[in-house]
Amino acid sequence: MTLEEKIIEIIVDQLEVTAEECVPEASFINDLGADSLDLAELLLEMEDTFDVEISTEDLKKIRKIQDVIDYLKVRNVTWD
């Protein structure tokens, strides 16, 4: 499973959307219907899964699926 596939799996589970809706340019709020609490829970799950801490400053910049992919790739994350 690639990093992108794992991210999409988490998004599908957390936001109860379909994998088809999870295109890189999809906005969590505008396209996937997430609210601020959903987004916070989603990013907490990402932190736990990928053993990375997302700073408050970085949280403000994550609005789309591609933002998460880019953020995690730069940090060379792995998961079990």
Curated annotation (Swiss-Prot):
Iron-sulfur keyword on record: no
InterPro entries: ACP, ACP-like_sf, PP-bd_ACP
Molecular function GO labels: acyl binding; acyl carrier activity
One Pfam family matching this protein: PP-binding
SUPFAM superfamilies: ACP-like (SSF47336)
PROSITE patterns according to UniProt: CARRIER
Entry protein name: Acyl carrier protein
